[in-house]
Regions:
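Short, cysteine/histidine-rich loop/knuckle motifs that typically chelate Zn2+
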Residues: 14
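Structural alpha/beta surface segment adjacent to cysteine/selenocysteine redox centers
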Residues: 17-103
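C-terminal cap of thioredoxin/glutaredoxin-like
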Residues: 5-11, 22-26, 102, 106-210
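Ligand/cofactor pocket segment of small-molecule handling proteins
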Residues: 1
Length: 210
């Protein structure tokens, strides 16, 4: 069994492509792959978001606005995950499509519409997105990122605990690189950056990922 943790900026086009690559690999590979899309929110993510939108990095008002919006989208995603991984993943992908492709602005109405389209129990969802459990899940994700030394979105950590006693960190990867690593045709000691950590060391942290 392989475990893939993909750390994402929910509102970055590159991360959308990364998600597609992981989903494609899980479908194509003969190996059993368990994967998580872990939202990342830090100053690097915020500044890259501003840069991609052509906004000055010293525009503190816009930086704060982007930070709050990303935080809200992440809490929405975590709340959707409480109703199942597939529903949560579908919600995230639908929100990304609405905001990045259709250029819709984040709003309560958009969140409700997307949740309903993804067959999410709306009453439960609206309560959970403002609850402590969603905030705790967000904080757990950020701790996991810190423990794995993740500072940038579009980073994936791959564990094959049946064979190896370490995790492999891939940054800004493509489908071919990820597939080669998972299928064993890429030597992690020579071809990719390696994050030396035992599977046991992350056992507790893995439990935090929902």
């Amino acid at each position: 069994v392989l475990e893939v943790y993909l750390f994402v900026n929910p509102l970055a086009n590159q991360c959308v492509q990364d998600e597609k690559n992981v989903l494609r690999l899980a479908n194509d590979s003969d190996k059993q792959i368990q994967f998580q899309f872990v939202p990342l929110l830090n100053i690097n993510v915020i500044q890259r978001t501003l840069k991609n939108q052509g906004i000055q990095l010293n525009d503190w008002q816009e930086q704060n606005r982007q930070s709050q919006m990303l935080y809200r989208v992440i809490l929405d995603y975590k709340a959707a995950l409480f109703q199942g991984k597939k529903r949560g993943r579908n919600f995230l992908i639908a929100m990304q499509s609405a905001m990045l492709k259709a250029k819709q602005h984040y709003s309560e109405e958009l969140v409700r519409d997307v949740a309903e389209a993804c067959k999410i129990d709306l009453d439960m969802f609206m309560e959970d997105r403002d609850g402590q459990l969603a905030k705790q899940a967000f904080q757990a994700d950020q701790r996991l990122a810190s423990e794995m030394n993740i500072t940038e979105a579009s980073s994936a950590v791959v564990f094959d605990c049946d064979q190896y006693d370490y995790g492999v960190l891939l940054e800004h990867f493509n489908y071919a690189t990820l597939a080669d690593l998972v299928n064993g045709t890429l030597d992690p000691f020579h071809n990719v950056p390696r994050h030396a950590a035992s599977c046991e060391a992350f056992q507790a942290a893995q439990l935090h990922v929902l």
